[in-house]
A protein has these predicted regions:
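N-terminal functional modules and adjacent low-complexity/disordered segments of proteins
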Residues: 2-4, 26, 117
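Intrinsic disorder/low-complexity segments
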Residues: 2-4, 30, 125
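Aromatic/acidic, Gly/Pro-rich catalytic loop(s) in extracytoplasmic/lumenal soluble domains
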Residues: 87-127
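Transmembrane alpha-helical segments
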Residues: 1-20
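Short periplasmic/luminal acceptor-recognition loop of GT-C membrane glycosyltransferases, typified by
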Residues: 14-70, 74-97
Length: 127
């Protein structure tokens, strides 16, 4: 019965049958790894697994934004983007370049990780 529950009702059932290479984390990691010593910021949302996939350490204390009302976490992320201090930014917003024009979208992927479809965007700093 437990096995049937897992197969039918597990929240990660949307991932069944997908190859690892089809995940946005691994697709974006391929792009990020083309830059030696790349830096990355997971902007404005919970950690999406992109740091681990790319083999990159977070550049700051607030490497993601949680659901806690901590102004410092947002301020640190805004400061990093204002200073163009990271090579890449991964976000769930498709208009980051409107506020930070030094970054442009180089990849996007719509993905269902079990909580509904979302679109991840990878931005690169314009050189």
């Amino acid at each position: 019965a437990a096995a049937a529950w897992c197969l039918l009702l597990s929240p990660n059932r949307a991932l069944r049958g997908r190859t690892a290479e089809s995940l946005p984390q691994l697709q974006f990691a391929e792009i990020i790894r083309q830059t030696p010593n790349a830096t990355l910021l997971n902007y404005g949302t919970l950690d999406g697994g992109f740091y681990t996939a790319a083999g990159v350490l977070p550049p700051c204390r607030y490497f993601c934004v949680t659901n806690m009302p901590l102004q410092d976490q947002w301020q640190q992320q805004w400061d990093l983007l204002d200073a163009a201090a990271v090579d890449y930014v991964v976000a769930l917003t498709g208009d980051l370049q409107n506020d930070y024009p030094i970054y442009h979208c180089v990849a996007s992927q719509t993905y269902n990780g079990g909580e509904g479809e979302v679109t991840w965007y990878l931005y690169a700093k314009t050189k």
